[in-house]
Amino acid sequence: MRFFALFIYRPVATILIAAAITLCGILGFRLLPVAPLPQVDFPVIMVSASLPGASPETMASSVATPLERSLGRIAGVNEMTSSSSLGSTRIILEFNFDRDINGAARDVQAAINAAQSLLPGGMPSRPTYRKANPSDAPIMILTLTSESWSQGKLYDFASTQLAQTIAQIDGVGDVDVGGSSLPAVRVGLNPQALFNQGVSLDEVREAIDSANVRRPQGAIEDSVHRWQIQTNDELKTAAEYQPLIIHYNNGAAVRLGDVASVTDSVQDVRNAGMTNAKPAILLMIRKLPEANIIQTVDGIRAKLPELRAMIPAAIDLQIAQDRSPTIRASLQEVEETLAISVALVILVVFLFLRSGRATLIPAVAVPVSLIGTFAAMYLCGFSLNNLSLMALTIATGFVVDDAIVVLENIARHLEAGMKPLQAALQGTREVGFTVISMSLSLVAVFLPLLLMGGLPGRLLREFAVTLSVAIGISLVVSLTLTPMMCGWMLKSSKPRTQQRKRGVGRLLVALQQGYGTSLKWVLNHTRLVGVVFLGTVALNIWLYIAIPKTFFPEQDTGVLMGGIQADQSISFQAMRGKLQDFMKIIRDDPAVNNVTGFTGGSRVNSGMMFITLKPRGERKETAQQVIDRLRVKLAKEPGARLFLMAVQDIRVGGRQANASYQYTLLSDSLAALREWEPKIRKALSALPQLADVNSDQQDNGAEMNLIYDRDTMSRLGIDVQAANSLLNNAFGQRQISTIYQPMNQYKVVMEVDPRYTQDISALEKMFVINRDGKAIPLSYFAQWRPANAPLSVNHQGLSAASTIAFNLPTGTSLSQATEAINRTMTQLGVPPTVRGSFSGTAQVFQQTMNSQLILIVAAIATVYIVLGILYESYVHPLTILSTLPSAGVGALLALELFNAPFSLIALIGIMLLIGIVKKNAIMMVDFALEAQRSGGLTPEQAIFQACLLRFRPIMMTTLAALFGALPLVLSDGDGSELRQPLGITIVGGLVMSQLLTLYTTPVVYLFFDRLRLRFSRKNSKPVVEI
């Protein structure tokens, strides 16, 4: 009583406290970073190693395995995967959430150093690592085009200057440059000319390496001067290499230009990049796992004027893709939704109270509570994102509830003729415990979320804390500022009989009278209501089992990502043509704004594409509808497939799969994996619940298998090392020397000129110089025959792995897809040597599915404990919790009606309903208990009176929560696919709960009261006087 009086009778202090809360909130709002979702990225580090010319199997056994054994000992590694392809190995380390990325990076470097002695010689550089997830979509893509500069020169400028500058920007984790490779001097040998001159490929290699050296020469000095010695020991251009003498034949000099074409070219000619229809160099920028995407993009944009200033006029730098506009638009939509919710909630209050002064009170209380929450969000290190702003939108209905309960009770006393200050004090005292009970029990709902681990726990933590803080501030405001404003702003008045006969007042009176009549009938037919109550419990269970489920709603971010997978024996020239054909099909689609792509590198038969769609307001279709339309057109392209998926703000795992979801097969036997993977992939491709089924297992690449005759080799004076060196020199794009320049280092690359390697007959032209100096053709000691070979070898941990990726057809949920896959795996009878499990997002979905029911039960149990403590009763909390089944039925039916699967966002809605609908029961039970204690009423009379007396505030709070959630349902702008499931769940649950709990709660109250009396009689014993 004194606590409430302290604030009611000291209005200046109360107003200043509210002003301080508001000012702190405004400051916090200005300092809060902006993001699409809470920070939920796993710490990921990518280790790269290369050995030019080495086969995928050689890379896997000699490079990947030693590194994996060393890296696998690092603490906190959640998952380790690797992919080895021609001359390249990439290992992805995904760490636990609580692992510091910088500490993990130090451990990774130490593990690489430990494995260095086990790695093969000939590697051009030590393995390196980057703190970025290669499977994440770039946050920004820049393109460089030029009419006069070559692609190699553009690539050099991009990687040497632009990428270095961009990588220094805060938040940037990796800048991947694609579309070409660094400049190089390429030596294309003529095998027939070499044979005629009796020059081996090793001799050419050694001559070039010896002619291009960079060694310190020292200095000469006398008593007065010092001269630095400088020589022309380096050759830097193709023109300088051509006259190089590599051999003497009968005293005549054989120069490099006599046996080879020497050109200024690039290190790897099998690379191509395009933007729209133009050749381009792509700078794909990815952020650090812990970085904020908006701040990072803003930092890059702020740097662009400086970058453009350093670019020559012949180069055009453009932003091909930027993830931030759709994120900003989505957040703006949420902010507008929040403003609409506040306005609708205040309108509900006005319609019920029909007083401008009375409406002004919650109109002040709601913004103070919401704005004050921003200060706590800043102190907690949160961001303004879709989930935290959705929490505030939903909180609008909650925070006004507290003010409504206090305000309505004070207004009731004023209408009875009590003086304003006395009414404020008395009204607040009466409902103070009720408000505290409602708020604490609502906060209790979110305690299990705060303790939830893994990605879902990280994702929901900001939502739970933000909402809990808003409720806490609202509780303080409703017990301090609200009664003070009521006491000083409202006036005593007689019951507004005339006003109640008009408009909303007349409707409320009619509803209340009708409710009273129907409630009397219900209380006389309690068994029927009990059957209805039990029916809702059973219906909840059936609906939860039957409803389709998914992890997270499919987002329309306006960005698509596509992976090209061509025939495994395709040439680079043909693959480049496929890239151009696919880009043309996509560019012609009316919803597409921009398309960039590249192909080449270690996987000739693959490529990547990034598509930016037009803004949501400029296209009629969603991103998924655009994909469905393009899928039909792209399927007509022979010899290759393009798998498109919408970029999501949440992507789990480090695998660069060609679809959104993955199912991984593991085996200790590579042969067993290669036998069963095609069978499983074929069976899964036939499932209607899956689309775009593809696999990263590519073991049908064309290979030419050479079989050495070792006896003949020994007789001819040839060893295996010389033969292998011949093949590497001829066909491996071997980097044989380094050219040092002020800004970078470039390579001299040697191979047989591509003009002489157009078919297998090129092997017949190869020869080895034996120990006697004679040229021995390769065909003398080797036979060759075509075979199949893997284009890549993949590991997970230390086991051979193959990942089958898939998308979902429109109208199919992830739960339906996973059930179909599990059923198919059982039917196929896969042997124990091959193990299958979901990975990435599908794996997290499975884990979340297993914990959802536990989470809901934990929330209910927590609320029960809190209510039990507050009421000092085992029974009354059960009465209050009896409101939940009807809300659950309403929520699940609404999701079915809107064809929305049960997702993590819908789970949040269910958790919120646990907190919302019990408020009705709390108000009924509180007043019924008070009427029994102080009024001497029977339980039947008490609960009947409580229901009628609290009908108006129950309607007000329910409608306020409903109208607060309604804008989430009706939103259709950017990010609406995230907001709608939450709104649908809450609105559906509130409507059903309001229809049923007004009747079931009184019946349950009486049932437990009679049960309590029955047990108390049985346990009662006669008092014995001593």
From Swiss-Prot:
KW Cell inner membrane (keyword) present: yes
Sequence intervals crossing the membrane: 15-35, 333-353, 360-380, 387-407, 431-451, 463-483, 528-548, 853-873, 897-917, 953-973, 984-1004
Q: How does it sit in the membrane?
A: Multi-pass membrane protein
Q: What GO MF terms are annotated?
A: xenobiotic transmembrane transporter activity
Matching entries from Pfam families are given as: ACR_tran (PF00873)
Q: Where in the cell is it found?
A: Cell inner membrane
Q: Supply the InterPro entries for this chain.
A: AcrB_DN_DC_subdom, Acrflvin-R, Multidrug-R_MdtC
State the superkingdom: Bacteria
Q: Which GO terms describe its cellular component?
A: plasma membrane
Which keywords fit this entry according to its UniProt record? Cell inner membrane, Cell membrane, Membrane, Transmembrane, Transmembrane helix, Transport
Family that this chain belongs to: Belongs to the resistance-nodulation-cell division (RND) (TC 2.A.6) family. MdtC subfamily.
Family matches, as HAMAP family:
MdtC (MF_01424)
How does the annotation summarize its subunit structure? Part of a tripartite efflux system composed of MdtA, MdtB and MdtC. MdtC forms a heteromultimer with MdtB.
NCBIfam families linked = PRK10614.1, RND_permease_2
What's this protein's name? Multidrug resistance protein MdtC
User: Which organism encodes this protein?
Assistant: Salmonella paratyphi B (strain ATCC BAA-1250 / SPB7)
